[in-house]
Amino acid sequence: PADLIAKEKEIAEAKAVELEAIQKSMEALEDRKTNIRVGYVYVISNIGAFGERMVKIGMTRRLEPLDRVRELGDASVPFRYDVHALIFSRDAVSLETRLHQKFVEQRVNFVNNRREFFYVTPAEVKIALEEIHNEANDLTGDVLSFDEWAEAEEFRISESQRKLQNV
């Protein structure tokens, strides 16, 4: 009986932890539903498709922000995108807007502002993020990752193979 009680107590504690995680997930979903400004700002590049001086600065409200990046790179470009920055913000809309404003003169498409490509490097975006953080650190939220280097694995392997074939 003591072993049975201990086992039941262990199961109950595990269920309590599981229930707490579910409640937190539900709270996060409710927060997103009531606050449409919450989300992730991402900075991505595709040097194989666009060269080394072009990034896309976008925003997503998805719980899994990398799903959006994968979706962008699925069929419309020859290589996968590299993620340079992923920033969670309680006001991702304003953060994205501020970044776009910082690079308004480097915008690739002046006709359609929904095309969020800019002639800048990831390093320049990092500097802009630091400036925005100093001006209004509540916008920048949590920088989950930042990497200035574009791995561009598929592109680099393809270029190496192309050079070998042309020898």
Which stretches of residues belong to each language-model region?
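Non-catalytic accessory segments flanking enzymatic or RNA/DNA-binding domains
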Residues: P1-V167
